[in-house]
């Protein structure tokens, strides 16, 4: 009997999400409005942060955040190469230069020491990445950023629901979360900027909507003058209420969704123990892991086949997988500009990373199916 294809990720959408979106569709106001405002309020309350601004994507959020910080031509921004390439793209599109640093071989996160070694006279910001639901050593990074007077913007795209030393990621400083379709909290496409910097938050809010001081809902629904003034040129990165309504329901479910992810991840760790798969290591500090991804490292010498062949073998058995990520400096555009850059840990992992299925609606027997498939693949190579 053939089994249905098991994707590496699938959003957990229930009747409450469908009803919430339907309510917005019937309300007569489907773009940025009251649901967007409620989402910002609820998200800030959950984290305990001062400001939350909803946007249409984490890429857009990073764009306007760096712009609001004054990043531009001649500046440098330090970021790990082993992350989604949108970070490097945004830095480059602002006219600045991404300065790539290597990551720890096992946690895939950059250290304060690596970041400080990369700081130069033109460094204006640091964009480190919480990886796969695990958390950065923020204290060290905050110390380095403060010592050099450099902005720190946490890429928390993987970390909604994660905690660092007992506090939610994003409760202090500035961070950006993603609500993309595969994330722990999804609204199809969306993001949240959070910060305790009032001036920065105000400018991000303005830049996300054409540089206007108010949005369309404020102007048309609250009786304010229909033509607001442009304070500065901005962009169109606002989040529609259709998306915000979906995110609000997901936010209420987040603890349960993440608890299920953790249970599945723990089952994987138990079931795959003893196999030469090298799952990611965990940092030494106290944390709550959000388990956005479950990542293996497939080394040809240890496993008898390389990562790409392993993924093809999973696919042949009806199981999806993903790569998170190919290091940014290995992409054609950046390789052309920094041909001599060597980041050994990022490069080693780029050739071996494989994300296997992990999402809340998986059944326990799905874990068993994946584990047996992996055992079968490895056994055939011995």
Swiss-Prot record:
- Give the protein's cofactors: pyridoxal 5'-phosphate
Q: Which InterPro entries match?
A: ArnB_NH2Trfase (IPR022850), DegT/StrS_aminotransferase (IPR000653), PyrdxlP-dep_Trfase (IPR015424), PyrdxlP-dep_Trfase_major (IPR015421), PyrdxlP-dep_Trfase_small (IPR015422)
Q: Which GO terms describe its molecular function?
A: pyridoxal phosphate binding; UDP-4-amino-4-deoxy-L-arabinose aminotransferase
Q: Give one Pfam family, short name only.
A: DegT_DnrJ_EryC1
Q: Name one GO biological process term.
A: lipid A biosynthetic process
Question: Which E.C. number(s) belong to this protein?
Answer: 2.6.1.87
Q: Does this entry carry the keyword Protein biosynthesis?
A: no
Q: Which UniProt keywords apply?
A: Aminotransferase, Antibiotic resistance, Lipid A biosynthesis, Lipid biosynthesis, Lipid metabolism, Lipopolysaccharide biosynthesis, Pyridoxal phosphate, Transferase
Alphabetized Gene3D superfamilies for the sequence: Aspartate Aminotransferase, domain 1 (3.90.1150.10), Type I PLP-dependent aspartate aminotransferase-like (Major domain) (3.40.640.10)
Would you say which domain of life the source belongs to? Bacteria
Q: Which reaction does it catalyse?
A: UDP-4-amino-4-deoxy-beta-L-arabinose + 2-oxoglutarate = UDP-beta-L-threo-pentopyranos-4-ulose + L-glutamate
The entry's cellular-component GO terms read: membrane
**Which residues are annotated as modified residue N6-(pyridoxal phosphate)lysine in the UniProt record?**
183
Top-tier EC class: transferase
The record's NCBIfam families line, in alphabetical order, gives: PRK11658.1
Q: How does it assemble?
A: Homodimer.
Role? Catalyzes the conversion of UDP-4-keto-arabinose (UDP-Ara4O) to UDP-4-amino-4-deoxy-L-arabinose (UDP-L-Ara4N). The modified arabinose is attached to lipid A and is required for resistance to polymyxin and cationic antimicrobial peptides.
Question: How is this protein named in the record?
Answer: UDP-4-amino-4-deoxy-L-arabinose--oxoglutarate aminotransferase
Origin organism of this chain? Pseudomonas aeruginosa (strain UCBPP-PA14)
